[in-house]
Structures are given as structure tokens and as C-alpha cells.
Amino acid sequence: MLHISGFCRYLCGNFDDEMVYVTRTEHFNAAHKLYNPRWTKEQNDAVFGRCANENWHGHNFELDVTIKGNPDPDTGFVYDVKKLSAIINEHVIEKLDHKNLNLDVDFMAGKMCSIENLVIGIWNQLVPHLPEGVKLHCLKLRETPKIYTEYFGE
């Protein structure tokens, strides 16, 4: 009996050196405020506008997590996307969803809660939990349909 991975190698060639990128999308809702305590209210309002609202504001965030690796010869997967989703949910979504980024999120403590700083913080939450052979390639974090950041760990 011919094993399917052997059959695929026979028909398609060996893909051990092929880099494939896989993206999983997750969502969370969170509130925050952009406000520099060293500045006056007027300066904060001038720089951050409505985002400096003293009563906070919120977003429906969309997070794309892109990993890269070689497809497993037996499964064809770079990594099981259900397992990737579980890692994202445990180490990111549960910490952020329906939270105040300024007050409730440990990895944002002492930082300006901009989308730029948030995407770096999310990266740092995910990297230690990915298995060997799976590399985090890119995070894309959408704050609104018109505003997003991309981070490649650089």
C-alpha cells in the first residue's frame, strides 16, 4: 500500500524546502485612550483628537496572524490552524477582549496604547508559544476598516 505522503512526493516532488505562509484571523473588542500624562489636556487633544477622550473609546479589532514554515509531509500543514487559533486565543484574545487596554492588560502597562505598541505587545505574547519549526512571520492588526498596522518582528 502506498502512503499518501509518498505518493504526493512521487507526483509533486519533495517540498521540504518550500516556505509556506498561513494566516489565521481572530477578533477582539477593547477600549483605550491615547493620552500622554506629561502633556496638557490641550496638547493631548491637539495630537490625539477624539482618541484622547477622558471617557475612553473602543474598537472592534481584527488580528491576522501569519506563520511560516515547511508543510509537514504527512499532513500537508505548516501547522494545524485549530492549534494556532487556540494559542492566539489563550495568549492574546483572552487578555484583550472586552478589556481596557490602558488599565487591564499587563503587557501594555506603562506604554502608550497605540495600535503600533499593541501589535508589538501581541507579537511578544505569541512568539514563545509557537512550536519549533513554526515561525511568526507577520501580524496585521486592524483598528478600523481604514487603519491597520503590520509588524514583522523587526
Regions found by a protein language model. Give the residues of each.
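Charge-rich, low-complexity N-terminal segments
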Residues: 2-154
